[in-house]
Amino acid sequence: MSSTILPTDPDVLPNRADDSAFIEEDTRLRNDIRLLGRILGDTVRDQEGSAVFDLVERIRQTSIRFHRDEDKPARRELEAILDDMSASDTVKIVRAFSYFSHLANIAEDQNNIRQMRAGSTAGSAPRAGMLAKTLAHAREEGIGARELREFFKTALVSPVLTAHPTEVRRKSTMDREMEVAALLDQRERLQLTADEWAQNEEQLRRAVVTLWKTNLLRRTKLTVLDEVANGLSFYDYTFLREVPRLHSALEDQLGGGEGGEAEEELASFLRMGSWIGGDRDGNPFVTAEVLQGTLRLQSARVLRFYLDELHELGSELSLASHLAPITEDVRLLAERSPDHSPHRRHEPYRLAVSGIYARLAATAAKLKIDSVRAPVGEAEIYANVQEFKADLDAIHYSLTKYNAGVIARGRLRQLRRAADCFGFHLASLDMRQNSAVHERTMGELMDAARPTSSYLALDEDERIALLTGELRSARPLTSIFIKYSDETVGELAVLHEAARAHSIYGEAAIPQCIISMTKGVSDLLEVAVLLKEVGLIDPSGRCAINIVPLFETIEDLQACAAIMDRLLAIPEYRRLVDSRGGVQEVMLGYSDSNKDGGFVTSGWELYKAEIGLLDVFEHHGVRLRLFHGRGGSVGRGGGPSYDAIVAQPGGAVNGQIRITEQGEIITSKYSNREVGRNNLEILTAATLEASLLQPRRSAPHHDYLEAMEQLSALAFKAYRGLVYETDGFVDYFWSSTVINEISTLNIGSRPASRKKTRAIEDLRAIPWVFSWAQCRLMLPGWYGFGSAVEAWVAEHPDKGTAFLQSMYQEWPFFRMLLSNMDMVLSKSSIAIASRYADLVPDEELRHKIFGRIRIEWHASVDSLLAIMGHERLLQGNPLLERSIRHRFPYLDPLNHVQVQLLREHRTHDPDEQVLRGIQLTINGISAGLRNSG
């Protein structure tokens, strides 16, 4: 029997005879998957024996029958196979299917890279999402290079990396998987000899065997600083080199000078952000000490990068003084260099670079960061990154002035851009805390200062009056003679540490303070008073940090425009906004609004909130910057970034956008340099498209807005009716999903729930969505849509489905909503979900709730296909359709095994091997779905 773990069933992988190019590409992808499947099969057979390999094949084939036909005999056969397996064999089976999911993902990613390269080398027309396409569109609209350069002077595109409480990837496995990817890439790019081809396969086998021998799961729980270190690895993989390169490429495309050089340097607009190490909301482990450690780790990463680049630059700039004249500034840099080697006496550029290296190494040493290589001598530290940039600029100017501009456009160009984008802090670290914590902290401080009053008893108007008075007052609110609670001491310590960080790394190190669960004006004023207390607001009213409200629930989204209208009318607060350049950032939360009101209503209320905020900010003459808290899954606002950005209301982007890149998708988007570069380009192109080109389009038709409001109300009623108003739903959820078992995984530093209750209201949105994904229902990404459409069509027989079809064709927002739902429903499986429903011990409850879910699922699929004019899910997305067909024969068995293990875990005494098996299935299913929560 062949040792190939590979789908061969024609119903699993049909060809597309209507598209020869697609078939050719599909064949190459299948060949890669076949290669990796064969190597994995050989590994399983060699390491675990033929019996285990044969068992893997039996489970896979039976699972395919069950998936295709909901075959009841196949279901019984599958259950019998799983019942007979030992605990140790179960773990081996799970690892085999999990690793195939990982390897199939690698093959798929490499195929996507291959297609990007093929399009580029063949001179194909640029795709939507590529900068070339957007720039061509701008030219068609009469927008020239000069106008575009002006646009980027005030533009901001900021991907913000977050940790993820259900991120299941280990760096050890990621490193080996990247090795596999590199070897596949080598087979594609290089013309290998027969010996080299054999050697390549041998290296692949070595990597796969190493993977098989490597723990998929962590043995210990991550600390926050572990999460920081994991996040920093993506700077090595992608950001430190690709962010500068993207700027250079765009700069060249906008240039008109000889040889393609830009007429003027493009302003840096792409800035990395992070929550990892600064997000305190619900994470008691993020302390002042952790904040300090995070900033030091970030700074160490970027300073070591600069030092490495300077070392290489010094090797390259061997220009002799009698062959290459220099400016006075470079002469002074060379004279100040501690490098006194006679061999470099007549190489002023090398001397200048060695002096810069020495100063940067001294700066790193002061920050207690070891440099990779010792400098040639002692030097004065850099007071700030501006001094470092000025020295690099001096070298650039000298090279350019004396006819060596081509040299300046090499490594030096990228280093100068990196210094401008990353500074000495690498990424802007946001602080985030829940408004309730700020409220308690302020209450304690106020009551200690005014023993006769009770701050928490005040109404909103009274709080606003008191807080604005504090902002006007010069006296401090805290006292060293008062003993405060541990919580208050901790909050003040974090803010003091932020102030200290500004003095060390610059204000860009911590530019935002985000208030989650913002409910009113006082929530922002409380933070302003706390910032004033630690010196982040000075006596003149200058604020050194942006105060950012985060509106998360449906109710808060509906109130956000009124809250900001009242806030911006307060002179004491408006003065703070003016000190920040007249820009106020507002964050919108996709996750909690979805958990609160369902997918349809969440999307619609977010859209309306943006329109309301635009009106308010225009009235007050303040620039609005939106920060989108999108998750990786559609249930938390995920989906294609380009479509999401260009579907924003006209004027909502306005040249500036911040957007979260959630932990569970960072790996797939940024672990590969080419893929990462493409994703950064997509964000940039979408921001440009939405800002300069979208406002010229007409607003959505009034009838569309009215219909969407009605659909939202109907979907909201259906969703809330199930999740919050159905007796027993909480019990059903906790019994039919892995929510209990998720808490045992060593995959994040933050607890899964805000409080120690089983209430849906207290559960974090991420594990909520993650749990529904694991059982293959994906309920947060579609529930309520089908019944809403059916009810709306029944109420509007004159318009009917044809009207909704027009909405889909003409309105980008509605099209994006349905496209994302199409993706979610395609990954769901009612057949598999029914097996999870069987875990609910109360038979009546099981039939009542799963019966409703099944009916709604079918209604949603039927309504979606009718509106899109499709006959099957993903008909308009053949790439994703193919991806799912490749992966699901290996994903479905993991679900079946997980159900079996959950039943055993919950009905027998605790067994470490069973629990480990459950954890492994969680990892494998997450990999197979390619998003986890």
From Swiss-Prot:
It holds the Pfam family PEPcase. GO terms for molecular function: magnesium ion binding; phosphoenolpyruvate carboxylase activity. SUPFAM superfamilies: Phosphoenolpyruvate/pyruvate domain (SSF51621). Its cofactor is Mg(2+). NCBIfam families: PRK00009.1. Belongs to the PEPCase type 1 family. This is Phosphoenolpyruvate carboxylase. It comes from Rhodopseudomonas palustris (strain BisB5). The gene is ppc.
